[in-house]
Amino acid sequence: STLLASSAASDVYKRQVSDETDNKAGAECNTRMMLTGQVFAVMSGTATEEQIQAICRSADAYLYDRKAGGYRLNTDFKEEKFDLGRMFGFAYGEKENGAVFSHMAVMYANALYKTGHAKEGYKVLQTLLDTAMDFERSKMYPGIPEYFDNQGRGLYAYLTGAASWYMLTMITEVFGVKGQLGDMVIAPALMPEQYDHCLLYTSPS
């Protein structure tokens, strides 16, 4: 019965991947990587420390594109596959097909900070900020767009929840102010270069 259940689950997975139950995601030898799977593996605590380090190295090697604005959602699969959701209906670098998708990028940063990888998390957040604030390139008001395209242009700022995740990460992970079992914990994870840009306000006693 276990074998049957496993087989049935596999068939369901394949149907979700492809309407034709033809799972070819890893059929070719070309390197293919998607950020989403890495993020949830780290954020859920499933990935080991060794695996997290490998994820960071691979993401830097295959997904990071400074010109585009940071970490792309996936590598270029170089195919049109219209039975795999809407992802491959877009040209590479647009929306879900390989754009720098701000929401997932910020969640990646959050996951890295939570697991003690502040340097790597800082790189994610800072690249997004630098791209958004480069108005000649981003061509948008200050803020976080849904995604940056191949040229680093910010698009659809009203469609994303990335800003709330960015603020959450800055407050609870970068500045390290969070609650824990009824206590307030302050455990900042600031990089040395951030100290010159931080101010501490205290109320008069």
Regions inferred by a protein language model and the residue ranges of each:
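N-terminal alpha-helical segment
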Residues: 5, 101-105
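A general alpha-helix detector
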Residues: 37-38, 104-108
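Single conserved hydrophobic/aromatic residue that forms the stacking wall/gate
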Residues: 2-9, 13, 201-205
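Non-catalytic C-terminal accessory modules of carbohydrate-active enzymes
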Residues: 61-66, 78, 89-97, 107-203
